[in-house]
Amino acid sequence: NPKHKNDLNRSIPFDLFGDLAKISGVKLYSLKVGPDFDQIKISPNEIKNLGSQITDFQDTAEAVSCLDLVITVDTSIAHLAGAMGKPVLLPFAPDWRWMLESDGSPWYQSMRLFRQQQLGEWSYPFQRISEALEVLSTKKQCNDELKFNA
C-alpha cells in the first residue's frame, strides 16, 4: 500500500517473488485484496490471485489454511498465519515484536524471520528464503490447484 506510512519497509519488489516461482514444486498465491493486483508484473502462470475471492478475515483464514507456508511482511496475515501454526517466512522484521537477536518468534513457533542486512535491500533475505524453499520443496509434493470456499 503506497499510502501506508511505513511502505518503504513493507513493499517488496514483485520480481523477487517471480524468482521464487522458478523453484521446483513452488506455487505462489497472492492474498492481496484490492484493485492493485495488476501492479504485480509476474505472469498468471507464476502467481494466482486469491485476493479476488477474499471478502473478510474469515476468507483470509480459510485461504491461509490451504497454504503450506506464508511469505509476508509484518501485516495481519503474518500474525494470522503464525497463530494458525502455519510456517511464516517474514523477510523484514525490525519491529519490537520480532526482537533482533533471533530468526524465530517467541509468540509463533512456526515463524522464521529472514532479516534484511540493509534497509530496503531485499536480495539477501530473498536469497535465504529461496534456499529454505529449495529444501522444503524437496520434502513435499504440491497439488496443482489451491481451492477454498470463499
Task: List each language-model region with its residue ranges.
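Catalytic machinery of carbohydrate-active enzymes
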Residues: 1-150
